Structure formats: C-alpha cells, structure tokens
Amino acid sequence: MANKTNCIRNGKKYYRLRVDLGRDSNGKRIRKTFYGQSKKDAENKLEKYKNGLNSGLTNDYDKLTLGNVCKLWLFEKVKNTIKPSTFERYEGIYRLYVKTSPLYPIKLKDLKSLDIQRYYNDLFNSGKSSSVIKNLNKLLKSFFNYCIDEGYIVRNYCIGKSITIPETSSVDENKKDDITVFTLDEQNQFINAIQNHRLKALFLLDLGTGLREGEIIGLKWNDIDFKNCTVSIKRAIKGVTLIEGNKRQYHLIEQTPKTKNSIRTIPFPENLVPILKKHKLQQKEEQIKSGSAYTKNDYIFCTELGLPIDPRNLRRSYERVLKKYNIPYKKFHSLRHTFATRLFENGVPLKTVQMLLGHSNINITANIYTHVMPPEKFKAIDKINSIFDMK
C-alpha cells in the first residue's frame, strides 16, 4: 500500500511516496519513504529500489552504510563505464580516504553534512592538501548523486554551501609549486646530453611538441606526416593497476587520450624530420636483429623487442640522463612545461598554446602558465621551428 503526498523538506517542495515493503529478518514491518521532484520521479525511485533488492541490497534499508553502498557503487556501477586509469584513481581515493574513514560506518539515513565537514577538517589538519580533499569531495559528490537517484537520500551533501573545502594560504598550491622548466642553458645541455641516446628522437619530439608522457609513448608511425610536419595524437599508453577481487596487477594499456581536446593534430619542428627518419631505420635494424621475438605494433617509440615502453622505464631513462650530466632534477613532465614556456616567451597566443597542449579549456592553460605569459601582443605559431635548436 502506498501513501502519496506533497511535502516540504529542507525548505524545498518534494513529492513523498510512502510504501509498505513487508517485514525484515526480525519480523519488523518495513516502511520506506521516497522523495522526488514529481510523482513520477518518486515512483521511479521506488522501482529502482525494488530492482536493487535483486542485486545484493537488503530490505533493511535503514542499515545501509555509506561505505558499503559506496563500494557497491564504485565496483559494480562505475568501474565498467570509465577508463581503467580513471578507475585506478577513484579506487585509490576510496581506499585511502573512504574505506578507512569515520564516514564508512555511518548509516546513510543518519548522515549529515557536518559529518563530512568534520572529516575534511581533520584531513586538512593532519597535513592533507586542499587538492586531495577536493578530489575526495568530487568522488563523494558523484556517489551522492547516485544515492539520490536510488532514493537513499534526498540531497547532495557535497554541493553548494553545505561543505567548505579547507584552503591553504599559499597561492595556487596545485600549479605553481609543480611547474618546473628547463632554463635555456639547461635545455641546450639536455639536448647535447642525448645525442647518442637510443631515445633521442623521443626526448626531442617531446621537447618540441609538449606531448604528455602517455601520448608520446602511444604514437604510431602512421600518426606522423613528414610532408607537413604534423603529428596526430589518437591514443595514450598508461601503466595502471587493474583490480579483480582481492588481486591487484600492473598492466600497460592503450586508451584514448585524456580529454576530447587531447585528440589533436599539431605541428612539430621540421628539423626533427631527419632525426625521426634515422630513428625509424634504427628501429628496423632492431627488428631484424630480434627476428621472431620482435612484436610488430608500429609504435614509433618502443622497446628493442617492439613492445610499448613502460612509462616507469621511460622516466628512469630520462632521470639517468639528468644525473649523468649533472642537470638539475626535473620531472619528465617538465619537458611539456618547457615547451609551453618557450612558446609564451616568444609571444605565441594563449589560445594557440591551449590547442597545442590539448587542454580541455583555456582557463587550465592560463592558470598553469600565468607567470610566463608575456604582456605584449601575441605572435603566430610559425615560430615553433626557430624556438628549439634541434641537432
């Protein structure tokens, strides 16, 4: 039997649907209330709830905890709808900041925004950065949207003024502290250091295009247009930990680039053409030498057996060059930052840099590189060939 009424909750109008769902395992009568923006909305939530009973949820709705439902949502609902690398990040947030948190055992019916705010404050006071808390809040916001759709809660505790993310007093903690670039002297020192390196072409192409690590590893020969000096980014190689049950295993996977804007065709310095062609000849020699042990994947940059390069090994190889030639340490990603910085130093427009880097919007580019953007009128992209002195 259902009782349908209009009501006001938290200052907002809802349609309320109360139903009798029988009795629980102790013989106690179960009455459940669903809220919706309309009668149809509330009825849909009731139907979803009933369907959920067949997928592991119990009639004892009041016993559902944030942790148990979040785990079910993440591993059964979300996992197969996102990239493996994205799921790896979500799972890490869940494992580190939900699974062992004081929020985990709280029943959804008892959850308050104050519980979440208190936990965020504790994380911040224990030394966790604002960015960590923002990422956690983003995950919980998506989770609570799911809970609303299922009728477990009526509002999202992570939206609006309910929650305040603790902030540091430092300016833009996520960006400026992480931006390190090669000076012109260091850039030239690095270029000289890799002249006889097996991955010389990779390092120079990255310095001359600003590709992300996974993007440059994922390049294939048919992505290169030698005539027009362009490279098309269509895929990325990622090292991810895949989770099946209680097992965690590291794999290299090929997936689409980071965002839609990351799928792009961009120019590269024309003085890299002979370097890339020489690299291709050396690759063919490795193929002949390896014989049947060689795997033909058409990757521009691969192991001596034709397999994709593990990002971890690429970083190690890069870092060995820095150490051997006493070049101040910088992350591999600094090649990308150096590319962008050189463009700004030479007056290339912000919008053009955004397009070349594949950022999803221009604000990302502006926020990262504000400190190097010149105040004078921007110039055209054809400067790219003169900026980098590739040898």
Describe every region a protein language model picked out.
Residues 134-138, 149, 153-219, 226-227, ...:
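Basic, Lys/Arg- and aromatic-enriched nucleic-acid-binding interface segment
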Residues 228, 235, 239-263, 270-272, ...:
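C-terminal secondary-structure termini that scaffold catalytic or DNA-interacting sites
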Residues 10-16, 21-114, 279-295, 374:
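N-terminal DNA-binding module of tyrosine recombinases/phage integrases
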Residues 237, 273, 338, 357-383:
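Catalytic-site neighborhood detector that most strongly recognizes the C-terminal catalytic loop/helix
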Residues 17, 116, 140-144, 216, ...:
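Short, basic/aromatic-rich helical patch in the C-terminal catalytic core of site-specific tyrosine
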Residues 34, 74-152, 308-313, 328-334:
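N-terminal core-binding DNA-recognition domain of tyrosine site-specific recombinases/integrases
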